[in-house]
């Protein structure tokens, strides 16, 4: 089976009933941030350059698997921080049941202030690379150069390391290496009320049991990143295999890879030898922009407002 047919099989695509779009701008949010982040930073338009804007929230007590309400996708799942990977991949599954997506998904946080011109520029840009260097658009010379490279970008974001990780550089040893990460435990130490929220389904869960995870030194920050149809298919297939259980113990790494969404996405894609391409211009933290006149150099500004 060729790659295109395999991807279409995994993504349940029936082009006779799908809504055709170039891509999806998927903004992950939660019920808590509807009156704050979503209200304050909602994109003015519902579509950019053929890419449809969708906001997703979880509702554990929904009477169906999912439903669309305007530009909102509500999925039947926990609405908690630690379940973000589950929310993301269920969203992908249902989006690919609804839309015939040409390219892929731009996954974004709900606290981003977008430069709409830069956003359209990115969406229209050919998503190819040559040995890790993007070809086409603002980070290369010509579209002809992009076509000459003929290597599709499946996974792109801004890495804190400032580095790419190409498929031939991904080793089994890298994937198997683990660290003890207290990030999620620290978060819940400061948010004890989340354990009492029935929408979060965390009653009796000991977060400290799940601190070991694969070490991911190169990969995108969870602020915003792009995943192609191929990458989305891999994520859906993987989460289907583990029953969307973010507390699943991975025997190969002897760790819990799925509790921190961006790290989990990198782990799954690297396990399938998917290259990661670093892009500095995707976003910048507002606090790091010393000269506010340079704010338009970035596609998005990470405000980090209403964090708590």
Give the ranges of each region predicted by the language model:
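N-proximal low-complexity "stem/linker" segments adjacent to membrane-targeting elements
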Residues: 1-36
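Catalytic donor-sugar/metal-binding loop of nucleotide-sugar-dependent glycosyltransferases
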Residues: 257, 266-282
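Conserved catalytic core of nucleotide-sugar-dependent glycosyltransferases
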Residues: 113-262
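A generic secondary-structure signal
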Residues: 43-44, 93-98, 122-125
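Short beta-strand-to-loop acidic/aromatic patch adjacent to the donor-nucleotide binding site
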Residues: 101-113
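Short, acidic, metal-binding catalytic loop of nucleotide-sugar glycosyltransferases
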Residues: 40-51
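Active-site-proximal specificity loops/subdomain of glycosyltransferases
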Residues: 56-102
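C-terminal helix/juxtamembrane-tail motif
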Residues: 290-308
